[in-house]
Amino acid sequence: MDLTKDILMIHSWVTQPYAKFWGLQNETKTTVKSTYQRIIQSCDVYIGYSKKGPILLLEVYNPANEAVGKHYPVRADDAGMHLLMAPPKQRKSGYTWQIFKFVMDFLFSSTKINRIVVEPDSQNYKIHALNQRAGFLVEKQIRLPEKSALLCFCTRNDYYQNISATRCNAI
C-alpha cells in the first residue's frame, strides 16, 4: 500500500455505511490518513486487486502487539487479520466468500502462520457468518477499547478441512 496514493480510496471505503465497524465512518481524510500512518507502523497493510481494479483492504498484525493479545495466550504462529471489501460496483452472489477464501489462502501460504485470529465486533453478523464458514471458532466475547468483540481462531487445518467439506457438500 502506498498511503499517499491510496488515501482517497481508503477514505472512501472506510466511510461507507457497510464499513461502520471500522469506526471511521464520519472521519475526515486527514484523520483517516493519520490513523493509517499509525497502523502501518505495526501492521502489514495490503490493497488487493483484480483485473478490474482494487477489491480489498487487508491488515495483518501480530496479536501480541495489540489489545487482543491481552485476552489469550498468543502463539508465535498467530496472525491477526482485518478485512474490508471495496464498495461493490454490482452485487454478485458468492463474491465476498471467494475474496475471503483468497485472503485466507494468502495468509496460510506463509509457513510462519498456522492460526489466524480475528476479533470482529459482536454486532457484525455478516462477518460472523463468513468466519464460521471458513472454520473460525469463537473462543469468547471480549471487551476491547473500541468495541465488544468475539475472539475467534482458525487454524490452517481447520480452514482447509472446512473448505474441503464445503466443496463436498456443494457436489
PLM regions and their residue ranges:
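C-terminal "cap" of GNAT-fold acetyltransferases
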Residues: 77, 144-171
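Conserved acyl-donor/pantetheine-binding loop and adjacent beta-alpha core of acyl/acetyltransferases
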Residues: 60-83, 87-91, 95
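Active-site rim helix/loop that mediates acceptor-substrate recognition in acyltransferases
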Residues: 24-45
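Conserved active-site alpha-helix within GNAT-family acetyltransferase domains
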Residues: 122-140
